[in-house]
Amino acid sequence: MELFDKVKALTEIQATSGFEGPVRDYLKARMVELGYQPEFDGLGGIFVTKASKVENAPRIMVAAHMDEVGFMVSSIKADGTFRVVPLGGWNPLVVSGQRFTLFTRTGKKIPVVTGGLPPHLLRGTGVTPQIPAISDIIFDGAFENAAEAAEFGIAQGDLIIPETETILSANGKNIISKAWDNRYGCLMILELLEFLADKELPVTLIIGANVQEEVGLRGAKVSTTKFNPDLFFAVDCSPASDTFGDDNGRLGEGTTLRFFDPGHIMLPGMKNFLLDTANHAKVKTQVYMAKGGTDAGAAHLANGGVPSTTIGVVARYIHSHQTIFNIDDFLQAQTFLRAIITSLNTEKVAEIKNY
């Protein structure tokens, strides 16, 4: 399967926080196909263990997260429209005028759009449009009233997830889709598992994907406790700022070196290891000072402290229906992660942990 087809398959899957099943099923099928036996944590994270033959080998964890941002129905109005609570961070300005799918408890899929006030209805009112609260945005399934919505099985607690088509940009260098945060990571771990399938390593690897990252790094807390790694590598996507006049995160500039974010500071040993590995592997990198967090923020606080970092890329307009990301950035990150994993051994892990 070509890279674009893999990206398309993963990004078009609809799976939000607490409803990661469709992505988990996809990952499980691919893991089994590659000859691995996946196991699960208590919240639904999926991982495989590739054990080393080296006695007391260090345990290295590589984790994506499966969930994308979405919404949950909080109320159904008399006119048959819905109001919601967000699952993950949303800018209200990107929500209106979009298409979604509502998933009922029985698995029925209902097309839904978000309503915006047409300019015609504002003329002569003297009203200046305001930024709406998420709780005020109209989600409309075109039902006549609440009773008809109920007949179709719609209820409070149902999930609403963006619906889009993944496409290639005109120049062929970029892809436009939803959910690259974090189907990027999901594709990275599958590609890594395929790369490592016939390799023996001096470290034991735990590779997979967490749940509920977008609502507070919840899955990482559980999985890191369960698998007890010596080092933790999150693979995640962050927002690019290049179209907003900021050099912090630019498309086409390679994988990110994330020395700092609000929930995590990279330890000196890890920083030195990443810089040396990137230089040796001739990987294109960019320093990224993040304003948000990744699962590394939860993992590094687990089990008495786990040196952690994030192997990432940036994308424009994340947490929306239309994200733009660079194909070569993905390939640079892929090369970097492979170099990292194949460089690790007992001595190197001890060096990284020697703060």
Curated annotation (Swiss-Prot):
Binding site for a divalent metal cation 2: D181, E214, H319
Transmembrane intervals: none
E.C. number: 3.4.11.7
Cofactor(s) needed by this chain: a divalent metal cation
Stretches assigned to coiled coil: none
Active site (catalytic residues): E213 (proton acceptor)
Cofactor descriptive note: Binds 2 divalent metal cations per subunit.
GO molecular function terms listed in the Swiss-Prot or TrEMBL record: glutamyl aminopeptidase activity; metal ion binding
Enzyme class: hydrolase
Biological process terms in GO annotation: proteolysis
Catalytic activity annotation: Release of N-terminal glutamate (and to a lesser extent aspartate) from a peptide
UniProt binding sites for a divalent metal cation 1: H65, D181, D236
Keywords: Aminopeptidase, Hydrolase, Metal-binding, Protease
Classification via Pfam families: Peptidase_M42
NCBIfam families: glu_aminopep
Family indicated by similarity: Belongs to the peptidase M42 family.
Protein name: Glutamyl aminopeptidase
Top-level taxonomy: Bacteria, Bacillati, Bacillota, Bacilli, Lactobacillales
